[in-house]
């Protein structure tokens, strides 16, 4: 079941974020878990232009999508963006990702966004994730390039 992320989900989402950090290119970066916890509060009702969704399978939070919306740089039109999109490895391919994306799209429409976007920047299953997004009607519009300093 896909539902809104709430304060009671913070511990479960923190566990997911720890897994995400270990699995992805972000494992090279330091983490301030107190800051992460505080940022989670922004996505569970703390800010009008931020939201979150969780994939809950019988009380087991196995996926999370944290999102926001803001004005386009060129105009006042709103666009939606993801902050975190993660599904636990043992639950991938079980429609959780699709459900989270659909919730994001609905939220974006409700907020008046003209567009929503998802970044595939984790370095994990990039091609597979891209194919899923394209099957669901999302278009590829670029890439992310990194250089460690």
Located regions from the model:
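A short beta-loop-alpha structural element at the N-terminal edge
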Residues: 1-15
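Conserved GNAT-fold acetyl-CoA-binding loop/helix
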Residues: 21-40
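A conserved beta-turn-beta hairpin within the catalytic core of GNAT-like acetyltransferases
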Residues: 71-82, 141
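A short, internal acetyl-CoA/4′-phosphopantetheine-binding micro-motif in the GNAT/acyltransferase core
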Residues: 83-93
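Conserved acetyl-CoA-binding loop-helix of GNAT-fold acetyltransferases
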Residues: 93-106
């Amino acid at each position: 079941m896909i539902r809104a992320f709430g304060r009671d989900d913070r511990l479960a989402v923190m566990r997911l974020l720890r897994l995400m950090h270990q699995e992805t290119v972000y494992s090279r970066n330091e983490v301030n878990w107190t800051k992460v916890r505080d940022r989670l509060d922004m996505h569970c009702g703390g800010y009008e232009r931020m939201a979150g969704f969780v994939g809950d399978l019988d009380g087991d939070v196995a996926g999370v999508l944290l999102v926001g919306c803001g004005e386009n740089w060129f105009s006042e039109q709103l666009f939606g963006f993801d902050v975190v999109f993660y599904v636990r490895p043992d639950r991938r391919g079980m429609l959780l990702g699709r459900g989270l994306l659909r919730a994001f799209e609905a939220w974006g429409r409700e907020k008046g966004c003209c567009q929503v976007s998802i970044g595939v920047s984790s370095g994990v299953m990039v091609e597979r994730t891209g194919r899923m997004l394209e099957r669901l009607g999302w278009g590829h519009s670029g890439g992310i390039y990194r250089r460690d300093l």
